[in-house]
């Protein structure tokens, strides 16, 4: 079969790699893809938001399955456009992708269906938001309602910071229309854990847990990023946590969406906070995380095509989802200066060192071919150096060893991904 993957990051590289392992897949296309994905797939020069062009390409090339990796096209309704043309596509429709597309929607859903989450209020007026902040308890969290590249969340230690945050989101429009509405919620303490799941509208199957490192610098210092590294599974995601979430969060979310007339088919990413009072939902994403996909998919035993098709066809209950009893660590190599200003266009050297090494992966996030055909950096997050091991300690040692195999001029990374768990 022929498969089209939509997106250009490390997540899409991991999806393409997993698809390439399926005996059912003869040919992979990726739109727009990147220089790393080009080794596995034919990259097509169509952007993720060019829905009509994507549909036309899928029809002209008799694509059997399209997989949407990114959040923007999902929230924008790309799945509806494909389905209207009777094309098979993996991902939630627009009316279900709102689970990620609007923080206010997801918070209201959790409140209505008693899914554990932080207390919150929603505001469409900066004046009202500021009035509320006068008597609020601190620290407090401000969130842009819409998509903001994973960076639209501000943790404010005091009233001054919070008032400035309202200005930033609602008046200065730092994230554009994403800040027209904001959610202000209580600050929760505890461990953050990510859990990925497959959903077919009725049934939910949990993949695995993962642990993200959002801050730019070692010791969780610096600015929030899209993620500087990850590992799977998370040792904090215990059997007790799993049982609680299965009882009160996972199926409850799927059922809530169905009750609202918004059946969800695709991947739900649960951002959880393990608080002293039990697990609570921080956020939902309507797709694989990045770099969560890079640490979860290499551990998955199943043929991913079978799972994608079961989600589309509503037969996920018949799938026995299985994962290796191992660990995976991904360390992001970024452009120095990310997530603020950084230079790009530097040649990436040493990629050939990953060839033929079973437990090592080099997932490209921000790379492209320059005019001379050399692979160069093309983003803040450039590469995801990833390794499997029998446990976290081994996987971590292998991943950090492999970060030395590849180089570019302004290479920057965190040195403490997964470190706290090894002492």
Q: Model features per residue range: what roles?
A:
Residues 367-372, 376-423:
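Generic C-terminus detector
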Residues 246-268, 285-357, 370:
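Active-site "cap" helix and flanking loop/linker of ATP-utilizing ligase/carboxylase catalytic domains
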Residues 21, 36-38, 60, 90, ...:
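Solvent-exposed alpha-helices and their adjacent loops that cap or buttress functional pockets
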Residues 1-94:
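ATP-binding N-terminal substructure of ATP-dependent carboxylate-amine bond-forming enzymes
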Residues 38-40, 53-55, 98-104, 217-218:
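Short, charged, surface-exposed secondary-structure boundary motifs
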Residues 4-5, 100-181, 211, 235, ...:
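Active-site nucleotide/adenylate-binding loops and adjacent lid/helix of ATP-dependent enzymes
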Residues 156-293:
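Internal nucleotide-binding/catalytic subdomain
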